[in-house]
Amino acid sequence: MPKRVLQGVVVSDKQDKTVVVRVERRFTHPLLKKTVRRSKKYHAHDEANTWSIGDTVWIEEHRPLSKLKNWIVVQGEKRAEV
């Protein structure tokens, strides 16, 4: 079975070797017929502490690394400096 890959934005990088990634999904509400956005936060492993807040990253399912970490960061894009 292939591993799931999700795209999201880093919202926290305070922990060592861990980032918190917010993944947003969109769906049509069955009753209102409107597009609704829902988000969920995932803790992901970042071995080199490369990613910082605002970066767009792709995370992939992995074996459990701790109580909360079941994902690893596989690639991403740095946020543009202003």
Swiss-Prot record:
Keyword rRNA-binding listed: yes
Domain of life: Bacteria
Any one of the GO CC terms: cytosolic small ribosomal subunit
GO BP terms: translation
Listed InterPro entries: NA-bd_OB-fold, Ribosomal_uS17, Ribosomal_uS17_bact/chlr, Ribosomal_uS17_CS
GO molecular function: rRNA binding; structural constituent of ribosome
Keyword terms: Ribonucleoprotein, Ribosomal protein, RNA-binding, rRNA-binding
Quaternary structure, from the entry: Part of the 30S ribosomal subunit.
Family statement: Belongs to the universal ribosomal protein uS17 family.
Known function: One of the primary rRNA binding proteins, it binds specifically to the 5'-end of 16S ribosomal RNA.
NCBIfam families hit by this protein: PRK05610.1, uS17_bact
Name of this protein: Small ribosomal subunit protein uS17
Source organism: Azorhizobium caulinodans (strain ATCC 43989 / DSM 5975 / JCM 20966 / LMG 6465 / NBRC 14845 / NCIMB 13405 / ORS 571)
Lineage of the species this protein comes from: Bacteria, Pseudomonadati, Pseudomonadota, Alphaproteobacteria, Hyphomicrobiales
Gene: rpsQ
